[in-house]
Amino acid sequence: MELRDLGKTGIKVSRLGIGTAALGRPAYINLGHAEDLQRNYNQAEMEARTHQVLEAAYAAGIRYFDTARSYGLGEQFMGNWLKTFNPKEISVGSKWGYYYVADWEIEAEVHEVKDHSLGRFQQQWLESEQHLGSHIDLYQVHSATLDSGILTNSAVHQALQELKEQKGIRIGLSLSGAQQAEVLEEAMNISIDGQRLFDAVQATYNVLETSAERMLQTAHEAGMGVIIKEAVANGRLTSRNQEEPFVSDLKQMAWKHQVGMDAIALAFVLHQDWADVVLSGASTVAHLESNVWANSVRLDQEDMDLLRAMAMVSEDYWGKRKSLSWN
């Protein structure tokens, strides 16, 4: 699999990466998540499943692995895999700023809580370091928004800069919501001693939600690494979705290229040269193997035009995402 630089971070990444939002905890908003886990939420068996997916990802050439403090036991599962499997020449990113509160309950009223305070950063960094050790290459603010306070919190900015200087770790932020572009624009203007604080950005971008494209390209041109999450829109761009009007055209294109709908969705993002790495969110080895076929898909202009025509109004996209059930 092709490797490239993650912007000017000095980190090498594969074009496809693996994210663990659906692996480290029993419930997530992906369509069919409960079926993927076969409704087996035993922690030891979930860790074994996670290791299988991570090993399959590595065998497929994936070299960027992404997790977060709020992904249940995601960091712990990945850390144990790193110790056991000892993969070579990989890069690891994690995130702080959300914490997991569901206590392994599927029907929990609240699954994660956002807190971008200095105290939360200090606590979660120690926890991330405990689980992942020296493997951490990129530490990201989880879901920065205009109202989360992170963009104006100079104490947190200074602490992030100190982490960068003391540990040699790159600093990033992930985005969510209809104002991704505005948040990124503000974040790019945050500097300490004349140096931009944030080295990389992780954003939602897919066939249905393209609103941040211009700013993501601008960030890439400015030297920031660009990581794309939710490329299959939490399962809406896979065969799990049989209801929405775009599904028929997506199915036909998948048949044309002899791959799954998921591979078409991922290929659309891989087609964007400003996207350094596109995360698979697979929770099974079979899904991962289907995702990897995206590397072989060559979309023509007709394909791209048809896919671009599927884009939704950003606010409508995020409204639909908010309505997805934890399962």
Predicted regions and their residues:
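N-terminal binding-site loop/beta-alpha segment at the start of enzyme catalytic domains
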Residues: 1-90, 94
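Conserved, mostly hydrophobic/aromatic
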Residues: 6, 18, 65, 78, ...
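Short, well-ordered coil/turn segments that N-cap beta-strands
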Residues: 11-16, 61-64, 86-90, 133-137, ...
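Active-site beta-loop-alpha junctions enriched in small/polar residues
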Residues: 21-23, 70, 95-99, 141-144, ...
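Glycine/proline-rich, positively charged
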Residues: 34-37, 41, 108-199, 207, ...
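Generic structural signal for hydrophobic
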Residues: 57, 128-132, 163, 187, ...
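Structured C-terminal cap/extension of enzyme domains
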Residues: 58, 63, 214-327
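Structural motif corresponding to the early beta-alpha repeats
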Residues: 91-118
